[in-house]
Regions:
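Structural microenvironment flanking redox-active thiols in thiol-disulfide oxidoreductases
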Residues: 47-89, 100-104
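Gly/Pro-rich loop segments of beta-rich domains
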Residues: 156-176, 202-234, 269-296, 324-350, ...
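N-terminal "domain-start" segment that seeds a small globular fold
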Residues: 1-26
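Short, internal strand/loop/helix patches
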Residues: 84-119
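Extracellular/lumen-exposed scaffold segments
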Residues: 404, 471-599
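Conserved beta-strand positions in repeat-built beta-propeller and related beta-rich domains
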Residues: 181, 186-192, 245-256, 264, ...
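Thiol-/selenol-based redox modules, centered on thioredoxin-like
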Residues: 120-182, 474, 480
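Conserved redox-active cysteine motifs that mediate thiol-disulfide chemistry
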Residues: 38-55, 508-509
Length: 599
């Protein structure tokens, strides 16, 4: 009995990027191994996959064509100019289909960001993988296809549809965060150029404003005077007495390298101070800062005697002690959602901005569009309603809405300023009154807010500059938006949840460190689940849906540890996937939900 082959669906969207203006279709891609990468530029897991794909693009050259299918979550991501900026910002060096209506997403039955689909040179789907961490599996599939279709004569290894746009000439390119230095200068992470820039003034358009550069500007990892970074973001100034002891003044969140770097301002020397360079996959128990794996550190702040790290890649805050040389989790469980409480129990979703104010630490949680506060060992949400609710609404904090904020700062009057990135605004929260207002709007993806020289300075990332905007407090009601996707009908009461997983060929489950399976279940709203929430070690679980809740989103995080079965020195692998499954609770709905974790 032969297995039927599935013809790949056509690529349909609003337009194309990185093709020199040409529209692509599968007929033009015939003869190539094609990998469709369904992504959205807000999603940290999608950004991880972009970096997993880079070595495959280099290895297989023109025999392989990666096609990014951009299927957006937030309203801002539907803007074609915002997508074009993101493609440049993150160094996407392959064609990208703009799929704002999720047409191609639906045609391939994608259910999660990111999803990868492999198409053979004859136009048939051969593999689908959801989530990140599939580089080795992709390498094996692509290698087999290249070998087999070379033998068949159906592989075209020459020519590429990718056409690079010429680089723009600006003093900064997609700056991320800024830091006021003693003496009045500003230090800025020039993220898309993989370097730090020291500015003598706020407007860097004039060459005279650039007082110095740290880093060669090449994407990479190198210490010393000729340092290299990889899309650096956050900056934190150490207290003078700490800096003297450790030999560096500033801690840098070197995001894509999964490192923290130390910078000595006197001569620009860079040192790696935390991280191995490998992306965090599971807790190894290590405490020495240079022995622990990090995951996309996005911001850093000095608070309570240490550097707090917004570990966006695993939805946690970490604590780095530069004197002791230790690092580890400080808040969060790695579950991506919104839950308050003691620091060890809270849930976050891509924390991306930090600001200390005495005994309080403020943070913005990008994927829940939330402003949150840490105080007295607990975290509470001030603004934000969950993973799928966002907008631009001022008023009482409980009713206010933001859209994917990336930066936060404390104003001289004690209020909190938020870089409300996808709304293009600076928002103000007054802890005394509990009110949220808009200070400035019409900005191009503001990513940080600081106070320097008595002025509020905004990193206007997509405009490639720093600005000190005129701040005119106003109330805005831009509406409430909710992410909508295809929904699954489930029956009330007990529901059987099953995660299907089979180790890849040549691998087996790895029991070396306990159970190789971990499954965490939560819901938005939390009231959707009467029982069955939390972490467990089984792939099958009975959960119970609460009476009186019409629906919501079931959030499932599953991971499986495997190792090579026969190798003398077996490599270890961790497969992880997050699902957000929108459900409606109806009488005739399904009583079982099955999700596939692909290795």
């Amino acid at each position: 009995m032969t297995q039927s082959r599935v013809r790949a669906a056509e690529l349909v969207g609003r337009g194309w990027l990185n093709t020199g203006g040409r529209r692509l279709d599968l007929e033009r891609l015939r003869g190539k191994v094609v990998v469709l990468d369904f992504w959205t530029f807000c999603c940290i897991n999608c950004l991880h996959v972009l970096d997993e794909l880079r070595p495959l693009e280099e290895r297989y050259g023109d025999a392989l064509v990666i096609v990014g299918v951009h299927s957006p979550k937030f309203d801002h991501e539907r803007d074609p100019d915002a997508l074009a900026a993101a493609v440049e910002r993150y160094g996407v060096d392959h064609p990208v289909l703009d799929d704002p209506d999720l047409t191609t997403w639906d045609a391939y039955a994608a259910r999660a960001w990111p999803t990868l689909v492999v198409i053979d040179p004859e136009g048939y789907v051969v593999s689908t993988m959801a989530g990140e961490g599939h580089r080795e599996a992709l390498d094996a599939v692509i290698g087999d296809l290249v070998r087999d279709h070379t033998a068949k004569g159906t592989l075209d290894p020459e020519g590429t549809p990718y056409v690079a746009d010429p680089p723009a000439e600006t003093a900064l390119r997609f700056p991320g965060k800024a830091l006021a230095l003693p003496g009045g200068d500003l230090l800025v992470t020039d993220s898309a150029r993989h370097r730090l820039v020291r500015l003598a003034g706020i407007e860097p358009a004039a060459a005279s404003a650039v007082a110095g550069v740290i880093g060669t500007g090449e994407r990479g990892r190198a210490d010393g005077a000729e340092a290299q970074f990889n899309e650096p973001q956050g900056l934190a100034l150490l207290p003078a007495e700490v800096a003297e002891r450790v030999g560096y003044d500033v801690v840098v969140a070197d995001t894509v390298n999964h490192l923290l770097r130390g910078v000595r301002l006197a001569d620009g020397t860079v040192t790696t101070v935390a991280g191995t360079g490998a992306q965090w996959r599971s807790d190894t128990g290590a405490e020495a800062a240079l022995d622990v794996d990090l995951s996309s550190p996005w911001d850093v702040a000095w608070f309570d005697g240490a550097v707090i790290v917004a570990m966006a890649g695993i939805h946690q805050l970490w604590r780095f002690d530069p004197v002791a040389g230790t690092a580890g989790p400080w808040a969060g469980t790695t579950v991506e959602s919104l839950k308050d409480g003691p620091l060890a129990e809270v849930w976050m979703a891509q924390p991306s901005g930090l600001a200390a104010d005495g005994d309080r630490l403020w943070l913005v949680d990008a994927e829940t569009s939330a402003l949150r506060c840490v105080e007295d060992g607990r975290m509470r949400t001030v603004v934000g309603q969950g993973l799928f609710d966002f907008g631009h609404v001022d008023g009482p904090a409980a009713d206010a809405l933001m859209q994917h904020p990336l930066g936060v700062g404390v104003l001289p009057d004690g209020a909190v300023a938020v870089a409300d990135t996808y709304n293009g605004a600076v928002r103000r929260y007054d802890p005394a009154t509990g009110a949220v207002t808009t200070l400035a709007s019409g900005l191009a993806e503001p990513s940080d807010v600081i106070v320097a020289g008595g002025r509020v300075v905004v990193v206007e990332s997509a405009a490639h500059r720093l600005v000190a905007p005129d701040l005119a407090e106003a109330a805005v009601d831009g509406g409430h938006h909710r992410v909508t996707r295809k929904r699954t009908a489930v029956a009330p009461g007990r529901l059987s949840l099953e995660v299907l997983f089979t180790p890849a060929a040549g691998q087996k489950l790895d029991h070396s460190f306990g159970s190789p399976i971990a499954v965490t279940v939560s819901a938005d709203p939390p009231q959707l689940l009467a029982s069955g929430a939390g972490r467990g070690e089984a792939l099958v679980r009975e959960i119970e849906l609460a009476d009186g809740v019409a629906g919501g989103v079931l959030q499932v995080v599953a991971q499986a540890a495997t190792c090579d079965a026969e190798a003398e020195h077996p490599a270890c692998h961790l497969t992880r996937q997050d699902w957000g499954v929108p459900v409606d609770v109806v009488a005739d709905g399904a009583r079982a939900l099955r999700l596939v974790l692909r290795s």
